[in-house]
Amino acid sequence: MFYDCSQLIYLDAINFDSSQVTDMSGMFDQCSNLKSVNLNNFNTSLVTNMNSMFADCGELESLDLSSFNTNKVLNMDSMFYGCSALISLNLNNFDTSLVEDMTYMFKDCNNLVSLDISNFNTNNVKSMIAMFESCNSLAILNLKNFDTTQVNEMNGIFSGCSSLKVLNIESFAYNQPDINTEKMFDNCNQSMIYCINKDNSPEDVINQLSDFPNLYCSETCFQNIDNKIIPCRNSCIDSWENDNT
């Protein structure tokens, strides 16, 4: 609808009737100068495809999608790919229970420091290829609620997350027989604290993480102290404090 509207800077869609729309793929793709968009009244209740919806909106700094109804969406591939100026992203009410594809979903969101996707239901997701690749400002990523039992492609999922200090993937399962886990942690922060379940992780994943000097922690809970999420176990807390003094 607005694909490649490179001159579009502001958009207030308060009066748009989107109640019958089923496909929003590429809707704002390559709106390279879009700085502000109001989608609070968007009706997305019938939408099944949000592929590349905001891809390459390189000037967009804030996006509140908490009003979106996504309970029918199957495809979120590249949804925020290339939103390089994005600082604030509100996905609090996203229902991802039917989503099958999250490939490149947050790739190249270079200025995103924090991302709360604790509400995501990923039990039907099959692809997470490069999902967070080159999110090089992201400091903490808590994915302890992620269900990856159906995922068969994780290659490059955290590649280029060069500022990542804490990563919790202890719930990750690698059940699919031909699952691709190549280069999951390429160019990640070498002082990163990672939390995994070693008993449920393939040798390839463990070998990749052996390059990181910090102790891993399994069965880890996270707590919020002074608006910072830190691991509860003593070994991880010591590593975290040593890394932040």
Language model features by range: what are they?
Residues M1-N244:
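Negatively charged
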